[in-house]
């Protein structure tokens, strides 16, 4: 099995990249893909860049170039669930766009025309993530992750998301675009991210301070999932 791993930013991929054995690098269109092995598992690690377009472009390149069997989206997220604190883990059961609106034509909020209302994560990958959470004894929440081309920093956008998507546990900028591409290619995916900030008016300050914590925690999770895959 080959596992595709996607992070948007340098800080979100650097720890995993350093753990890749027999590493080779592929660069195209502003994206970087690092291939090799972690814990004996073949991996292809993508640094996509920030936002939905960069994520979709990079994911397409990853799937075409490296042909992974599954995809894990890692990195940081803003917490929406009240039980989440910096460093805690979120695992997607589904993802939606929070900034797509074609409701005038009968679609649900966040649903893109011609697409499912939500993109469902793979149950087997979710189960592996939950096993890793138990092993590492981390606080985690499973649920809806929402994505859009905005860093949520303020009461008004936060209130809009909470009102429109009351079940959302976290918000970030790439996961749904990644899931959208995986859906088109019929490749199973899961989002496993760590909380860098609680989405509020000071979230930009928290993000700058705690991104490294989120990167460390999400890396621990990905490594634990890979170790479980290697043992099977």
Swiss-Prot record:
The UniProt record lists the EC number as: 3.2.2.9
A Pfam family of this chain: PNP_UDP_1
- What CDD domains does the annotation carry? MTAN
What are the entry keywords? Amino-acid biosynthesis, Hydrolase, Methionine biosynthesis
> What GO molecular function annotations does the UniProt record carry, in alphabetical order?
adenosylhomocysteine nucleosidase activity; methylthioadenosine nucleosidase activity
Pathway given for this chain reads:
Amino-acid biosynthesis; L-methionine biosynthesis via salvage pathway; S-methyl-5-thio-alpha-D-ribose 1-phosphate from S-methyl-5'-thioadenosine (hydrolase route): step 1/2
The residues that the entry says bind substrate are: 78, 152, 173-174
Domain of life here? Answer: Bacteria
Active site as annotated: 12 (proton acceptor), 197 (proton donor)
Q: Which reaction does it catalyse?
A: S-adenosyl-L-homocysteine + H2O = S-(5-deoxy-D-ribos-5-yl)-L-homocysteine + adenine; S-methyl-5'-thioadenosine + H2O = 5-(methylsulfanyl)-D-ribose + adenine; 5'-deoxyadenosine + H2O = 5-deoxy-D-ribose + adenine
Any one of the GO BP annotations: purine deoxyribonucleoside catabolic process
Q: GO cellular component annotations, sorted alphabetically?
A: cytosol
Q: What class of enzyme is it?
A: hydrolase
In the UniProt record, does the keyword Ligase occur?
no
Complex formation: Homodimer.
**Function recorded in the entry:** Catalyzes the irreversible cleavage of the glycosidic bond in both 5'-methylthioadenosine (MTA) and S-adenosylhomocysteine (SAH/AdoHcy) to adenine and the corresponding thioribose, 5'-methylthioribose and S-ribosylhomocysteine, respectively. Also cleaves 5'-deoxyadenosine, a toxic by-product of radical S-adenosylmethionine (SAM) enzymes, into 5-deoxyribose and adenine. Thus, is required for in vivo function of the radical SAM enzymes biotin synthase and lipoic acid synthase, that are inhibited by 5'-deoxyadenosine accumulation.
Family that this chain belongs to: Belongs to the PNP/UDP phosphorylase family. MtnN subfamily.
Protein name per UniProt: 5'-methylthioadenosine/S-adenosylhomocysteine nucleosidase
Q: Which organism is it from?
A: Pectobacterium carotovorum subsp. carotovorum (strain PC1)
Organism lineage: Bacteria, Pseudomonadati, Pseudomonadota, Gammaproteobacteria, Enterobacterales
């Amino acid at each position: 099995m080959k596992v595709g791993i996607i992070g948007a930013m340098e800080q979100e991929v650097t720890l995993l990249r350093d753990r890749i054995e027999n590493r080779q690098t592929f660069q195209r269109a502003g994206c970087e893909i690092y291939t090799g092995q972690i814990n004996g598992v073949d991996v292809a690690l993508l640094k996509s860049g920030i936002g939905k377009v960069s994520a979709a472009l990079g994911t397409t390149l990853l799937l075409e170039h490296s042909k992974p069997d599954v995809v894990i989206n890692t990195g940081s997220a803003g917490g929406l669930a009240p039980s989440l604190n910096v460093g805690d883990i979120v695992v997607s059961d589904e993802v939606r766009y929070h900034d797509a609106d074609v409701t005038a034509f009968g679609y649900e909020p966040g649903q893109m025309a011609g697409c499912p209302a939500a993109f469902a994560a793979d149950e087997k990958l979710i189960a592996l993530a939950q096993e890793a959470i138990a092993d590492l004894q981390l606080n985690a929440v499973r649920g809806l992750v929402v994505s859009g081309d905005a860093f949520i920093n303020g009461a008004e956008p936060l209130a809009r998301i909470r009102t429109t998507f009351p079940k959302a546990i976290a918000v970030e900028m790439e996961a749904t675009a990644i899931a959208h591409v995986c859906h088109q290619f019929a490749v199973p995916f899961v989002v496993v991210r760590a909380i860098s900030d609680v989405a509020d008016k000071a979230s930009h300050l928290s993000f700058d301070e705690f991104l490294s914590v989120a990167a460390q925690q999400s890396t621990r999770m990905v490594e634990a999932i890979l170790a479980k895959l290697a043992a099977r």
